[in-house]
Amino acid sequence: MQRTAGTEVTAMLKQGIDSSAWQGNIDWDQVKNCIEAIIIRAGYGKNNIDQKWVPNVEAVRDSSLDVGAYWFSYAYTADMAYMEGCYAANAVKNKFGDRQIPIAFDLEYDSVAYAAKKGVKIGRAEATLFAIRFLTAVKEFGYRPMLYTNIDYIRNYFDLGVIRAAIPDLLLWVACWGSEPKDYNMAVWQYSSKGSVAGIIGNVDMDEVYVDMEIRDGVAVPAPAPVQENGRKQMRVTAKTWLNIREKPDVNSEDLGDLPAGTVITVDKIENGWAHFEGYCSAQWLKQ
């Protein structure tokens, strides 16, 4: 799937990137002409601030870009994850004050490998708990909770049902390069790690942002939230290719098949982001 920043977008879609010190010196005057949203790494581990956090933030803070932050985790206990959330929130507070931007918890393969070197095996229970503790700290500081993850980690590490029960206003940021995930009610989709944007030398991660990440003047387009709508209705599949059908309202339940784009189905209930008909599918990709 070939995409470039700066293409035509809808009112509910913003083209964005995420950046860190790995991108080196960025020409933000050029970049800001190509994108509408940016998620910047604030730091990692035990209060290590990203080397480009300050210049990157100062270049975009007062622009029209929709801004978020993320923190790469090296936590191997729940207390460490909570403290990382505090470190991240403090970094954001120092630069954004009380502006309500999201802060994402980023636990990946290197995080798990680091924990293993410390004699700790991070499994589904641990990863889920760490995410909740980090995001709890973020919320305590008044910032929006976001989880960065990929399909493998959703299936094998993060229990999204448990996390969403603990963090109902969770923003989900899903990395799935080359194919669009359908089941996860995501706020941001990272669709490539090899994007090209004027003003950045080398590759950069590319994102599609479906919500207003920052709450400005008390108003934001919310992330998909738990709702219940009863009553049968005809709805059309708006996904670009197909939409998975699940046996239960859970991304880890049995895959019963798929609905091609444009298919019209009769939905009898929408609850917690899932539409029920003969099976279940993500309500995010249905429209009356």
Where are the predicted features?
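Hydrophobic anchor at the start of a short beta-strand
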Residues: V67, R144-M146, L172
